[in-house]
């Protein structure tokens, strides 16, 4: 699996969820949701929430998320866009009301914002001062997250790599658009094509 291959040889693996935690196919199923992925792989979930304009209500929402499916796999909470003062106020209350540990917070960092557009984020090559922004984010993560407790969530058996079959000889050629306009490609997709015996050929629709 992609997870087993990517996690092999590393101390921890991160799987990023998208959309709402339980939002899956068609928006009416939990299949292919972040929860479904965690349930399939047996992963602990660090739920990132933004406490904007709410406090005790946030505890109610978290309890709902934690009880909506059994098991929920939610193992901890991270408060995003949160001040140190707000974190100090909310964390004890949320832990008492939900039974879930609050593992830290990330403050607002306007100077580290990476913009977005109607089709998603800008690519790395388009972001000005990307390395400086990443450094600011890394410093904030190091300072404001309880790393010992977070890493304790990762203490599980490493995934077992499946037996890799011999790559069959190339049978088909798959053309993949790649240029300034067509630059959002998942390396894992190309790898899967090649593993299945396809030859990947790049071309530019602009030229």
Give the residues covered by each predicted segment.
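ATP-dependent carboxylate-amine ligase catalytic core
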Residues: 1-41, 49-76, 84-89
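Glycine-rich phosphate/diphosphate-binding loops that line cofactor/substrate pockets in enzymes
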Residues: 7-8, 166-171
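Hydrophobic/aromatic ligand-binding patch that stacks against planar heteroaromatic rings
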Residues: 36-37, 94, 192
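Short hydrophobic alpha-helical runs that function as membrane-insertion/retention elements
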Residues: 45-48, 103-105, 201-202
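Residue-level signal for short, function-critical loop segments
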Residues: 51, 81, 178-180
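Internal gly/pro-rich beta-alpha loop/helix module
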Residues: 55-166
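Phosphate-binding active sites in nucleotide-utilizing proteins
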Residues: 170-207
């Amino acid at each position: 699996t992609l997870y087993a291959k990517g996690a092999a040889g590393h101390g921890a693996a991160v799987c990023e969820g998208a959309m709402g935690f339980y939002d899956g196919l068609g928006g009416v199923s939990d299949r292919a949701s972040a929860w479904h992925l965690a349930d399939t792989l047996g992963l602990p979930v660090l739920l990132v929430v933004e406490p904007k304009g709410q406090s005790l209500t946030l505890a109610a929402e978290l309890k709902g998320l934690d009880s909506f499916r059994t098991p929920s796999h939610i193992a901890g909470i991270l408060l995003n866009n949160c001040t140190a003062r707000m974190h100090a106020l909310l964390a004890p209350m949320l832990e008492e009301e939900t039974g879930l540990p609050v593992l830290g917070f990330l403050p607002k960092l306007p100077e580290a914002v990476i913009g977005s557009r109607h089709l998603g984020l800008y690519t790395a090559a388009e972001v000005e001062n990307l390395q400086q922004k990443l450094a600011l984010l890394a410093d904030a993560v190091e300072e404001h997250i309880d790393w010992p407790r977070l890493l304790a969530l990762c203490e599980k058996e490493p995934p077992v790599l499946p037996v890799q079959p011999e790559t069959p000889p190339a049978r088909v050629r798959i053309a993949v658009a790649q240029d300034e306009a067509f630059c959002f490609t998942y390396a894992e997709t190309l790898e899967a094509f090649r593993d299945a015996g396809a030859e990947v050929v790049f071309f530019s629709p602009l030229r």
